Structure formats: structure tokens, C-alpha cells
Amino acid sequence: MTAVLPQSSESSQSPQLANDIKLRDIINTLPKEVFVKNSRKAWTKVLINVICVILGYWAVAVSPWYLLPLAWVFLGTSLQGFFVIAHDCGHRSFSNRIWVNDLVGHIMTLPIIYPYHAWRILHNHHHKHTNKLGVDNAWDPFTTETFNSCSPTLQWFYRRMRGWFWWMGSIAHWAKLHFTWSKFEGKQREQVRFSVLLVVIGGGLAYSAVFLTFGITGLIKFWLMPWLVYHFWMSTFTMFHHTMPEIPFKLEEEWNEARAQLSGTVNCKYPWWVEFL
């Protein structure tokens, strides 16, 4: 994986599409059944993941120290399943009712301390501007000029985040972009404020109770380690989907929405147990 993106790269080729093609033209070619929501499937997924998360916390509580890593992996991966459900809610594909999407989305993101509306709005921006250099907010790479203008320390951190410490990428993204509601305008600002206060107050109360009951060891055991596993998957999924060497990021004047949506994302397959959870 390349650590720095040159300003102009011809290493990747977009699908052969007409210059004036619109994303809507492509969407219109899809069969109607792909847009039909399946409520039974959606709620079954919620039930399965809730059960898995409960089992995960139980496993963490009862496991001897040498089995805790397995329990953390199971719980953290199940919490990633919560985020997948919230992802569908953010795209309004979980339910036909917006309030149901928002309610379920907030419930699913509360345990991982993720402000739902902030993520939803920023994620929609990412899809609207997929792989548009300097505009997309997911794994947007430095240009060669930007990288060379950075201090050696920042260059070192940039390479590490794009290398061995990729699994921390989503933590930096989460902390930097999702808690400042003043960056949003109008109705969106109020929505983000609500989501931020919900996770800060709710998460603060819940994990304060864990700390007061079990101490710092309990906080590490029940929150930090599963949370890090969750972010391992979050970082891995998003990085693999958008940062393969052959995936181009384009300057705005060169960028085409349809091409970006078709060639800017890689579909990845994971082990069956990851797909299930």
C-alpha cells in the first residue's frame, strides 16, 4: 500500500464510461427488487447481534485471564456488527421510517461511543465525494507536496497510520471529526449536538459505573479492549475498501461521481465468522 499519493497518477484506470454519465444513470439500470427493504431480515440481524454482544460481555466476565483475548475478539467483532446495523440506518436502508432508523442507529452506536448523526452526515458526505482528493473524509491521502511540507514527526505518524498502526486510523477519525457540532449548520447542528451529548452522557455514566464497580482493571477489561477490537475492524474495513494501490484519488476538476463510485471502492470478503457477527 502506498503511503503517499502523487498529484497525478495514471496507475489506475476507471471503467470505460461515457464522459457525461451520471450516477443516476447507473442506479436506474438496477432491478427494483434491490431497493425493497426486508424488515424481517433487518430485525433478525438486530436480535442476533444483541444476543452476541450479551454473550460477549458474559464471556469477558467469566473467562480466565488466558481466554480473555478470545472473549475480547468475539465482543469487539459483535460490536462492529452493531455499527453495521447503524450504517444501514444511516443510509435509511434499515427501515422505511426515518425515526426508526435514527432510534436504532443511536442505540447501536451508544455502546461504542459513536455520535450517530455526526457519523451519518459525514458518511453521506464521504459517499457524495468518494475519493475526491481534499474533500472525501475517509482515508484522504496526502499529496506529495503536502507530505513534503510536513514536519518529520508528522511524516513519521502519517506513515505509521498508513502502515503497522492502520488499526488506529478510525480512532483518529472518530476523535477529530465527530464531536464538534459547531462545524455543522442548521438542523444538522442540533442533530449532531443531540448525538454527541447522548454518547458522552450515556457512555460516561455507564463506564463510570464500570470503573466504580470494577476499578481501572474492569474498565480496561469491559470497555477498552473490546473497543480497540471494534476499531481494528472499523479501520481495516474502511482502509481496504478505499486505499488499494490501484484505487485513484482525483482532484476535483478530474473527478467524476459515477467513476468514483464504481472504481473507488473494493468489495472485500472476510472469514465467515466475521461476516456473521
Task: List each language-model region with its residue ranges.
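Short acidic-hydrophobic sequence patches enriched in Asp/Glu that either
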Residues: S95-L103, P115-A118, L228, E254
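Residue-level signal for short amphipathic helical patches enriched in basic/charged
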Residues: Q80, Y114, H231
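Acidic (Asp/Glu-rich) catalytic motifs at the cytosolic membrane interface
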Residues: L79-W99, W119-N131, F237, H241-M244, ...
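Non-catalytic, topology-defining segments of multipass membrane proteins
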Residues: M1-T77, I85, D102, T109-M225
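Select transmembrane alpha-helical segments in multipass membrane proteins
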Residues: V100-H106, V274-L277
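Acidic, Ser/Thr-rich low-complexity segments on the non-lumenal side of membrane proteins
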Residues: Y116-H125, S263-L277
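Juxtamembrane/interface helices at transmembrane-helix boundaries
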Residues: P69, T213-M225, V229-H241, E246-P248
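Membrane-interfacial segments at transmembrane helix termini in multi-pass membrane proteins
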Residues: H231, S235-W273
